[in-house]
């Protein structure tokens, strides 16, 4: 179980309140598919993923990125219970979709990069550390059913 201090919770929620879920989600998932091209195999139904511009402009990538980031919003609301929050999604990704759980960690790291780019100096080392802890906790919760 991940424990967040009051300061970490504030750092996470203060940034989250300013996140454009649609834009940031699409960019994070798009970057994942570009930077780690082997992750594309889980998105065969998304159509053209042949280049960075095709991926970043793909409406299905953007829509799924929004969906992913919307679920991350549930983590922000339930920082003290990530495992239960992601129990059903963990089961889906493990049993039905067979997603490599390492991809959750990779996507979390890419999301932190996207947030740093968007928030610049506001994304201080302390804020970065809190978000890194969050995405690691979410990745662990999503990987739970694999163990």
UniProtKB/Swiss-Prot annotation:
Can you tell which superkingdom this protein's organism belongs to?
Eukaryota
Q: Which GO terms describe its molecular function?
A: haptoglobin binding; heme binding; metal ion binding; organic acid binding; oxygen binding; oxygen carrier activity; peroxidase activity
> What InterPro entries does the database record attribute to this sequence?
Globin, Globin-like_sf, Globin/Proto, Hemoglobin_b, Hemoglobin_oxygen_transport
- Tissues expressed in: Red blood cells.
Q: What's in the keyword line of the UniProt record?
A: Heme, Iron, Metal-binding, Oxygen transport, Phosphoprotein, Transport
Tell me if Membrane is a UniProt keyword of this record: no
Sequence positions that bind heme b: 64, 93
Q: Where is the Globin domain?
A: 3-147
GO BP, sorted A to Z:
hydrogen peroxide catabolic process
Protein's recorded name? Hemoglobin subunit epsilon
Native organism is Notamacropus eugenii (Tammar wallaby)
